[in-house]
Amino acid sequence: MTRVALTSAVNLAKKLQEAGIRHPAVLKAISRTPRELFLDNALAHKAYENTALPIGQGQTISQPYIVARMTELLLQHQPQKVLEVGTGSGYQAAILAQLVPELCTIERIKGLQIQARQRLKRLDLHNVSFKYGDGWQGWPNRSPFDGIMVTAAAAKVPEALLSQLAEGGVLIIPVGEETQQLMRFTRRSDRFSSEVIETVKFVPLINGELA
């Protein structure tokens, strides 16, 4: 990580702290992660702006505030094993991999998955398992998970993901179509409590279609 990138990442973390992010480990991970690595060169100059940016294939790299907020919500439950649905650029995975012992991540667009794997390897993050597949179905063979994070908006909550939560596990997911709400579901035996966190805007979670 260059000195300029490090300074920019540290400044981004400070902006996120001012915006309400409080978890010190999340802020530290943001400050150590070169976001420009996850963007095309043409957009690298925008890497440390607090905004979502296109990454091709109709997908985006999420706004840093949302990355930090979702991570903070997940870490409140101290997960040991996490599933990320929607690897995308790999930036969210890079943040999570610094904060949890084991991360599994699924992507339905092969080209994005290949790029993300290469980027995390460059950052020496080796506690991540990758899967090319339909995120709606989760990763049954690797379940249960203490935490599941979905980085695209589902029209409804996928039952498969709820079923793959461990006891006490949490699902962080944007739900809705035109109007989306970031929600947290917590498993208690065979029951699930739900909590609306805030209004958000994500690309849609596509069901069953690989690219």
From Swiss-Prot:
Keywords: Cytoplasm, Methyltransferase, S-adenosyl-L-methionine, Transferase. GO terms for biological process: methylation; protein modification process; protein repair. One of its GO terms (cellular component) is cytoplasm. Its EC number is 2.1.1.77. GO terms for molecular function: protein-L-isoaspartate (D-aspartate) O-methyltransferase activity. It is an enzyme of class 2 (transferase). The active site is at 62. It is found in: Cytoplasm. Pfam families: PCMT. It catalyses: [protein]-L-isoaspartate + S-adenosyl-L-methionine = [protein]-L-isoaspartate alpha-methyl ester + S-adenosyl-L-homocysteine. NCBIfam families: pimt, PRK00312.1. Catalyzes the methyl esterification of L-isoaspartyl residues in peptides and proteins that result from spontaneous decomposition of normal L-aspartyl and L-asparaginyl residues. It plays a role in the repair and/or degradation of damaged proteins. Belongs to the methyltransferase superfamily. L-isoaspartyl/D-aspartyl protein methyltransferase family. This is Protein-L-isoaspartate O-methyltransferase. The lineage of its organism: Bacteria, Pseudomonadati, Pseudomonadota, Gammaproteobacteria, Alteromonadales.
